[in-house]
């Protein structure tokens, strides 16, 4: 600090007096301070519904096939002939958390170009158990995705009635590669 700066500082501090007892100062935190919430932009687009639900009885296996999909595809899916490329475990999760997880999982699977995934929703002992409510919501949510072609109850070694296989639509790139592969064979 040069001499001019020091004299300016002393002039500015001329009438300042030190606190006599600094221990008497207490800071009170302001009330209703909320931690900034991180907005999950992916969840802003979440279209999955959580309204009124028709509970699917445990005795009824989960099964859905989009119109236009060949019956053979569902048969192969049901018999576990398609390898599972990813799985999602929803066991003991609240319904709203399951909703977010299913949405993110399917979106990520589509972005990664996956075709077949497994969702483990659990199974309860009665129709109104939490696991069966989640199971019923999963069945509803999967039909709300245009890119879900089919789903069905998994085989026992993959979770049986506590899980389901999901077949996703091919991406445009996968369709193009498939077309090129088959076009080369026909020449």
Curated annotation (Swiss-Prot):
It is an enzyme of class 3 (hydrolase). Its EC number is 3.1.-.-. Keywords: DNA-binding, Endonuclease, Hydrolase, Nuclease. The keyword Cell wall biogenesis/degradation does not apply. InterPro entries: Endonuc_SmrA, Smr_dom, Smr_dom_sf. Residues 88-169 form the Smr domain. NCBIfam families: endonuc_SmrA (NF033154). PANTHER family: DNA ENDONUCLEASE SMRA-RELATED (PTHR35562:SF2). This is Probable DNA endonuclease SmrA. The lineage of its organism: Bacteria, Pseudomonadati, Pseudomonadota, Gammaproteobacteria, Enterobacterales. The gene is smrA.
């Amino acid at each position: 600090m040069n001499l001019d700066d020091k004299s300016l500082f002393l002039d500015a501090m001329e009438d300042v007096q030190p606190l006599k007892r600094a221990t008497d100062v207490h800071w009170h935190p302001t009330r209703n301070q909320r931690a900034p919430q991180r907005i999950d932009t992916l969840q802003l687009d979440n279209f999955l519904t959580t309204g009124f639900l028709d509970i699917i009885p445990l005795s009824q296996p989960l099964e859905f096939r989009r119109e236009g999909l060949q019956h053979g595809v569902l048969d192969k899916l049901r018999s576990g002939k398609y390898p599972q490329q990813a799985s999602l475990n929803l066991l003991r999760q609240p319904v709203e958390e399951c909703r977010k997880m299913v949405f993110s999982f399917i979106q990520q699977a589509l972005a990664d170009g996956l075709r077949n995934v497994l969702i483990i929703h659990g199974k309860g002992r009665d129709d109104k158990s939490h696991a069966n409510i989640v199971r019923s919501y999963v069945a509803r949510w999967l039909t709300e995705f245009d890119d879900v072609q089919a789903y069905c109850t998994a085989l026992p070694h993959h979770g049986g009635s506590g899980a389901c296989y999901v077949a996703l639509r091919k991406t445009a790139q996968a369709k193009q590669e498939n077309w090129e592969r088959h076009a080369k064979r026909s020449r």
